[in-house]
């Protein structure tokens, strides 16, 4: 239970806070202010004390009411005349109005006692009781001949409305403040009211509705001299003028009003007995009869005279609802949650509920805000936990690596699962009710499709030459350096057993830098053709291609190339491939080997036949051509005239011109499609490679593409993919900065970095070049490579501006600057390097890294001299007379003093060097000289050795 504050107790008791503070001090409890908290036992004692005091107060009030005397006798006319004198000069407080008894019956009733008058009243001029001025009203006196009914005289009640005077007919006169209990005091008149600020009298305002009153019988008119009338008025005088209403008063100045109960007089609800503010009597049935008899109770704080509700009862006070605070019981769920929070483990002062092994799925690059949202915890608390428990400095919105999220989950007893990119993309597509990777429809909807064949192997083993022989083209002659540096896709038609069959070939690079391309080609293929040179045998990239094919679970057909060379040995190749699990059919295996010569065009038809037989025997290649197209982006690049272009392989469905397509983080509408020969096509069926125009940007090679119903869905999917990939890259690039490696991180921040901006003609080439450059090992931590920009297409002005501001080097791979950007780069001093072969770029960047290394120095001995004599020179010190034993002694060279083979002093300098009386710069072997080294503790036969530090090349 929460502790209660003093002001809350005061509100509950209906008293002021200082009264509660005083009571606590009487009880011996020390509290500082009304905002201090009070313990539960003290609250109980305080409630008992206040309940006892309230009972005693009520008993005292009851006794006082019993001891109240009867109404005083009416004063004599002389006393009334004397009493009227001070009222003429100023406002004199008048006595309280007698409180009428309950349920007045028709008949003779007591008339109000006339109060002091300003002058003698004319005879016969008595008005109605409801029309008498408030200042001339006193206790009621019975009519002559009638027995008056005793009415207890209530005590005076103080009025808090300064605008209650009726001297000018604008309201009632202020009521005098009652004296303190047990004593008497002179009444103090209130301030004179301003006529414009006086509230209109109820029932007398022009246009105001009359106050509802119960009908009462008319009281007999008092006789002459028995009731106070209006000064200067008589029975036959003119009627009393109705006061004109002033301006609308402020609600704070309005007197509180309540509906008049039957009987005309309103009962007082004050906490202590007191009369009303108006004149008494409850007159006749006139418009003001009895209107002010009871007076309106003051709305004040509890415990004060005239107070209504308790302290804080005003609605809206301090932003709280009106009335006393309610203490409702907490539900079981709230109590259970509080108990759970109390039992939650604390991490560095932060309580976080335990996960109890609950599994939390987070995407790549998630932040603490994402984690906190999943477990319903404030991210600021998680930041504190990471800093105190894991020792890492992070922010709530920073993308975190997967291992950091998993470590945090272990600390909080959660099992964190980082969603893989494949699952992430599948969940994204499922949110749009899209299924990727499966054919839609029944078995009857599936139709045969052409096999997709990937040609793989080591560099320079003849892969592209083989495709040229199959297509009767000469692609290899146009490639830079004679090597393939991007993926090419082609579809050819061959005749097998008199039937035309289509085969789609994918040519992959064989250079070691294109590992990702070979893996991508193997994933998109049905059959892998492994090309091995008969004169070279199995090489590293050959073994890597075998691993990719086995990982993709595709059958392999081996083409032993270059059998026309005199050094060719096909049997040796078969024996080597046996070690990798590829056993030829003639050796009892299930792998087909075909000996070919791509250059001489030998046995090419046999290779195509072997591919078709393998596809028919081991694979059931079918697809639904009627569904929306899905497939894979093999390559992508930026064309100057056509914009973003992507070479895609349709795997399912049919791609048509005008379809809305999304490929990775790129989207658009298919404007045109081209085949491998540059001819326009209107649709592409399964296993057909085409070039697509119309994408918003260049996608990454290897991204999947699919056709959606409209451009809006394509845009949403592409934007969400881009955002997720960006978060993943941020998490990958962020380095874990812990308290343990803080100093090391600061030192790494001071190391040299080679900043690069890579621009290439193909997306796959840029990817391969970046991966190869980041793998360069300079052999030290002093330098590093950081790629700050990459892209496909010509070198733009934005690339040059970025390089100029960051000091980066631009690498153009088969691209050039557009327009006058080359001149801009020269003016801004930006270094642009152009390459057409990937290994040339790798070699030069590696050389540049080594050139950035800090130089290393080695010590080289110059010469030695033996001391023969010691000379004392004034203001200089001891000077050695020596003979040069070896090498050369040079002035300002570094020196050390050696005595009996032990270094006596190091870090000395040859300050002076003389040959006889001449200053010289050096003295060679065999000559005598005077040497001053600035060191006086020298002895005969000491050796002076001179040396210098020379820079040595870094390996």
Swiss-Prot record:
Compartments reported by the entry: Cytoplasm
Residue numbers binding GTP: 457-464, 507-511, 561-564
UniProt protein name: Translation initiation factor IF-2
Region (G4): 561-564
GO molecular function: GTP binding; GTPase activity; translation initiation factor activity
Domain tr-type G residues, every copy: 448-620
Species classification: Bacteria, Bacillati, Actinomycetota, Actinomycetes, Streptosporangiales
Gene for this chain: infB
Chain spans, region G3: 507-510
Annotated keywords: Cytoplasm, GTP-binding, Initiation factor, Nucleotide-binding, Protein biosynthesis
Location (main, coarse): cytoplasm
Regions of compositional bias (Pro residues) in chain numbering: 95-121, 149-159, 188-202, 209-223, 238-264
């Amino acid at each position: 239970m929460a502790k209660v504050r003093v002001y809350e107790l005061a509100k509950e008791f209906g008293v002021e806070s200082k009264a509660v503070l005083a009571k606590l001090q009487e009880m011996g409890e020390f509290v500082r202010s009304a905002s201090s908290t009070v313990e539960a036992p003290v609250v109980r004692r305080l409630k008992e004390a206040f309940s006892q005091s309230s009972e005693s107060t009520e008993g005292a009030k009851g006794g006082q009411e019993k001891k109240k005397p009867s109404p005083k006798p009416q004063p004599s006319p002389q006393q009334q005349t004397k009493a009227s004198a001070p009222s003429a000069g100023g406002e004199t407080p008048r006595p309280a109005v007698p409180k009428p008894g309950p349920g007045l019956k028709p008949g003779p009733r007591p008339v109000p006692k006339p109060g002091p008058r300003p002058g003698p009243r004319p005879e016969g001029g008595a008005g109605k009781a409801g029309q008498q001025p408030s200042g001339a009203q006193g206790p009621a006196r019975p009519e002559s001949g009638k027995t008056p009914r005793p009415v207890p005289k209530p005590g005076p009640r103080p009025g808090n409305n300064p605008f209650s005077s009726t001297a000018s007919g604008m309201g009632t006169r202020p009521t005098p403040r009652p004296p303190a209990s047990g004593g008497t005091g002179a009444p103090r008149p209130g301030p004179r009211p301003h006529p414009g600020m006086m509230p209109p009298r109820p029932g007398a305002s022009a246009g105001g509705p009359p106050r509802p009153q119960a009908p009462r019988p008319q009281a007999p008119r008092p006789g002459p001299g028995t009731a106070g009338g209006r000064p200067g008025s008589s029975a036959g005088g003119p009627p009393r003028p109705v006061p004109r209403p002033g301006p609308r008063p402020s609600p704070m100045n309005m007197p509180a009003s309540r509906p008049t109960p039957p009987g005309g007089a309103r009962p007082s609800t004050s906490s202590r007995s007191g009369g009303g503010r108006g004149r008494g009597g409850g007159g006749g049935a006139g418009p003001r009869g009895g209107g002010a008899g009871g007076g309106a109770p003051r709305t004040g704080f509890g415990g004060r005279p005239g107070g209504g509700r308790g302290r804080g009862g005003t609605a809206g006070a301090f932003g709280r609802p009106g009335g006393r605070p309610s203490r409702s019981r907490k539900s079981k769920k709230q109590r259970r949650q509080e108990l759970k929070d109390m039992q939650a483990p604390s991490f560095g002062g932060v309580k976080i509920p335990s996960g109890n092994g609950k599994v939390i799925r987070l995407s790549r690059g998630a932040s603490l805000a994402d984690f906190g949202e999943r477990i319903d915890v404030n991210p600021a608390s998680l930041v504190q936990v990471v800093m105190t428990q894991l020792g890492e400095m992070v922010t709530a919105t920073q993308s975190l690596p997967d291992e950091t999220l998993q470590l945090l989950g272990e600390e909080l007893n959660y099992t964190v699962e980082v969603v893989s990119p494949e699952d992430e993309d599948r969940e994204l597509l499922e949110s749009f009710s899209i299924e990727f990777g499966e054919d839609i429809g029944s078995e009857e909807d599936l139709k045969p499709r052409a096999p997709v064949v990937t040609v793989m192997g080591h560099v320079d083993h003849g892969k592209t030459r083989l495709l040229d022989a199959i297509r009767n083209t000469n692609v290899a002659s146009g490639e830079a350096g004679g090597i393939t540096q991007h993926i090419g896709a082609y579809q050819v038609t061959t005749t097998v057993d008199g039937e035309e069959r289509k085969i789609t070939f994918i040519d992959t690079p064989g250079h070691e830098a294109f590992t990702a391309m070979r893996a991508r080609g193997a994933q998109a293929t049905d059959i892998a053709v492994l090309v091995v040179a008969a004169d070279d045998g199995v090489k590293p990239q050959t073994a890597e291609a075998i691993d990719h094919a086995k990982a993709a679970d595709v059958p392999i057909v081996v083409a032993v190339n270059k059998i026309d060379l005199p050094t060719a040995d096909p049997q040796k190749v078969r024996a080597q491939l046996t070690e990798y699990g590829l056993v030829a059919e003639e050796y009892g295996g299930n792998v087909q080997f075909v000996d070919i010569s791509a250059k001489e065009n030998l046995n090419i038809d046999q290779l195509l036949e072997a591919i078709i037989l393998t596809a028919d025997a081991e694979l059931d290649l079918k697809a639904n051509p009627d569904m929306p197209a899905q497939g894979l982006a093999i390559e992508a690049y930026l064309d100057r005239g056509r914009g973003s272009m992507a070479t895609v392989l349709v795997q399912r469905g049919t791609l048509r011109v005008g379809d809305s397509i999304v490929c990775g983080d790129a989207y658009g509408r298919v404007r045109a499609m081209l085949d491998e020969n540059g001819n326009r096509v209107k649709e592409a069926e399964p296993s057909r490679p085409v070039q697509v125009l119309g994408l918003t940007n260049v996608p990454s090679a290897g991204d999947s593409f699919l056709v959606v119903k409209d451009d809006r869905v394509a845009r949403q999917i592409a934007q969400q993919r881009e955002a997720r990939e960006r978060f993943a890259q941020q998490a990958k690039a962020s380095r874990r900065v812990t308290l343990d490696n803080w100093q090391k991180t600061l030192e790494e921040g001071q190391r040299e970095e080679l900043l690069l901006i890579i621009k290439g003609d193909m997306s796959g080439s840029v990817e391969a070049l970046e991966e190869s450059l980041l793998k360069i090992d300079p052999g030290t931590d002093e330098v590093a490579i950081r790629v700050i920009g990459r892209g496909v297409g010509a070198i733009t002005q934005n690339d040059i501006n970025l390089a100029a501001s960051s000091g980066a080097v631009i690498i153009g791979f088969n691209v050039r600057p557009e327009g006058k950007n080359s001149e801009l780069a020269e003016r801004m001093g930006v270094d642009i390097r152009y390459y057409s072969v990937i290994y040339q770029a790798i070699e030069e960047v590696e050389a540049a890294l080594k050139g950035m290394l800090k130089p290393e120095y080695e010590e080289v001995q110059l010469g030695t001299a033996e001391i023969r004599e010691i000379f004392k020179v004034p203001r200089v010190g001891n000077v050695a007379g020596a003979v040069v034993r070896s090498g050369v002694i040079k002035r300002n060279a570094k020196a050390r003093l050696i005595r009996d083979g032990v270094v006596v002093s190091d870090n000395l300098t040859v300050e002076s060097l003389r040959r006889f009386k001449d200053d010289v710069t050096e003295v060679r072997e065999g000559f005598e000289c005077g040497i001053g080294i600035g060191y006086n503790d020298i002895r005969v036969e000491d050796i002076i050795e001179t040396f210098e530090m020379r820079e040595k090349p870094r390996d």
